């Protein structure tokens, strides 16, 4: 959703689901690690942190641009292909939401309808770390 990075969540059930999904797709052993995030990360003025409080036009465009392999404006603030953001926080676009995104990109609904529909879906959270500077604030528990 937010570009190539190390993804975490505050929701254990979501972490377990995603671990299972990775094992089904790639094989291996299902593993869920627990980390503690040092809150001082939000005081570090050298980090570029992007936070989406909930579904919004900006959030939807950001995810669409990160998932679009043909998106060329990687320096745009509307994507993170170049890891301009050290940390991005916001809702997860789950499989139901992906169907809505496709409906939008195919021109069958407008952006306002997309956002309205997203607010009725069960949303989860994700923290995506994109640089070593941001990762230093994570500690294994």
Segment roles from a protein language model:
Residues 1, 17, 21-141:
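Conserved NAD+-utilizing ADP-ribose enzyme module
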Residues 2-7:
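A short, exposed loop/beta-hairpin motif centered on an aromatic-Gly-Thr core
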């Amino acid at each position: 959703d937010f570009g190539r990075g190390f993804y975490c969540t505050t929701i254990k059930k979501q972490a377990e689901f995603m671990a299972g999904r990775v094992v089904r797709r790639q094989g291996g052993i299902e593993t869920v690690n627990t980390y503690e995030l040092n809150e001082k990360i939000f005081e570090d003025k050298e980090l570029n942190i992007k936070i989406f409080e909930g579904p919004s036009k900006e959030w939807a465009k950001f995810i669409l641009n990160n998932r679009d392999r043909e998106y060329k404006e990687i320096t745009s603030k509307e994507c993170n292909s170049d890891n301009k953001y050290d940390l991005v926080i916001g809702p997860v676009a789950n499989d139901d939401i992906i169907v809505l995104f496709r409906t939008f990109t195919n021109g069958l609904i407008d952006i306002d309808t997309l956002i309205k529909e997203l607010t009725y879906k069960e949303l989860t959270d994700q923290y995506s770390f994109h640089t070593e500077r941001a990762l230093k604030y994570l500690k294994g528990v």
